Amino acid sequence: MKRGSVALFAISFFAFGWMTHALYNDAYKMIKESTLKKIKKSGALNVVLLNAPSTYYIGSDGPKGFEYDLLESYANHLGVKLNITTANTIKEALELSKNPDIHITSASLTKTPEREKEFNFGPSYFEAQEQVVCNKSLLLDGRFPSDADSLSGLRVVVGDSTSYSETIESLKKEGFDINATYTAEYSTEELISQVDTHEIDCTIIDSNIYALNQRYFKNIVLAFDISNRRQQAWILTPDSKMLKNDMYSWLNTVNQSGEMARLKDHYYSYVLFFDYYDTVMFYKRIKTRLPKYESYFKEAAVKYEIPYSALAALSYQESHWNPNAVSYTGVRGLMMLTQDTASMLGVKNRIDPQESIFGGAKHLDQMIKSVHADVTGEDRLKFALAAYNVGLGHVADAQKLAQQLGLNQNSWADLKKVLPMLSQKKYYRTLKHGYARGNEAVKYVDAIYDYRDILQKNDVEVSLTTK
């Protein structure tokens, strides 16, 4: 072969190789960038959601949570349905995000330098700052911390693989003496509960998580902010450029339309923040508010065979007998009905006192009838009230758990021991309906019975008969 032919062959060979490599790279990029098209074609957006109040949980009338609602909005924008995989801890959520079939991971995740090295974050949708919360008894013994220096000697526990553990490690490098423990066993909410019961002294949580939980734990106190405000974002599947670009565009629309502001107000702006045990105010409202609605309560009580004092007490627990009451979750009226529940009950105007009272009575009647037949007497009403608060599914889960623990699943005395366990990962991860604020349901029923007792003692009702 002549030299010229050899040279030409070599050039052709390398040119062909370069073109093949370039075409392969372009094709590879097209495949990687087609995640958005694949989602639309399959009709499903596969997401990981942290099972927590700030993110996703099953409420009394279905799925709830700020990030769940936001993802549902994005799925609607794409014209697909959400396919949800739940995680019980942030560490578990991060592990699940590595599954190539998962498109988005949502777990109130703070964008940190360390995380951005490993994960592909989408656009930011929320800001929060980390806060140290401690048991209030530390105020009494002079050990309550005011800054990172004063954490020395305290029992501080935070979640493993969280931004909180990164914050502590960063502070240690700066010379702060913080003897913190990192755990993958407990969720953030479980650690808050441990602070409340003083199993540990302090933990670190995001400001939005503190806002959601401070109402339920009377012994936790905000100590100080331990970080500046930082951005939170979803983790996207790798090389999802088209998905990320579409998300930026959608998020801009959500912000401009006011939908984001409405969602934040829905979950984090507390229009009602009641002191449920303010008996002095309760006595006052028996005289000033109850008479306006007394006839409606009595008529509904007769129609649905529900004790009048229990129905009136339920309404006070829900709204303080304020017909215009609106809660952070969007429920409203004297009986605090959701829009979906109101529609199901035939209630057209939730702030109309008569409609709300009869709708709430009908809803409670449905709960009573849905409680297992083996639950009898006074307990039947208590089970129904718990279901009114947290949902029938979670009450059924608690009964199943009670049975597993060798307790009487049809006894309120035993069920109230089990309901708080629905917020503990080792229990709720095995149950059909997942995480629930079972402790809140117990307090809810107890409060209603406190009010009911006061009403009865004031001769509002001479005797109580149960269905």
Swiss-Prot record:
Enzyme class: lyase
GO BP field: cell wall organization; peptidoglycan catabolic process
Active site (catalytic residues): E318
Record PROSITE patterns: TRANSGLYCOSYLASE (PS00922)
Region listing for LT domain, in residue ranges: 273-467
Cellular localization per UniProt: Cell outer membrane
Keywords (A to Z) from UniProt: Cell outer membrane, Cell wall biogenesis/degradation, Lyase, Membrane, Signal
Keyword Lyase: yes
Membrane topology, record value: Peripheral membrane protein
EC number: 4.2.2.n1
GO molecular function, one term: peptidoglycan lytic transglycosylase activity
One of the record's GO cellular component terms: cell outer membrane
Pfam families documented for this protein: SBP_bac_3 (PF00497), SLT (PF01464)
Keyword Transcription belongs to the record: no
Cleavable signal peptide: 1-15
Reaction(s) the record says it catalyses: Exolytic cleavage of the (1->4)-beta-glycosidic linkage between N-acetylmuramic acid (MurNAc) and N-acetylglucosamine (GlcNAc) residues in peptidoglycan, from either the reducing or the non-reducing ends of the peptidoglycan chains, with concomitant formation of a 1,6-anhydrobond in the MurNAc residue
InterPro entries assigned to the protein according to its UniProt record, in alphabetical order: Lysozyme-like_dom_sf, MltF, Solute-binding_3/MltF_N, Transglyc_AS, Transglycosylase_SLT_dom_1
Region (Non-LT domain): 16-271
Role summary: Murein-degrading enzyme that degrades murein glycan strands and insoluble, high-molecular weight murein sacculi, with the concomitant formation of a 1,6-anhydromuramoyl product. Lytic transglycosylases (LTs) play an integral role in the metabolism of the peptidoglycan (PG) sacculus. Their lytic action creates space within the PG sacculus to allow for its expansion as well as for the insertion of various structures such as secretion systems and flagella.
UniProt comment concerning the protein's domains: The N-terminal domain does not have lytic activity and probably modulates enzymatic activity. The C-terminal domain is the catalytic active domain.
Family according to the record: In the N-terminal section; belongs to the bacterial solute-binding protein 3 family. In the C-terminal section; belongs to the transglycosylase Slt family.
Name of the featured protein: Membrane-bound lytic murein transglycosylase F
Gene name of the encoded protein: mltF
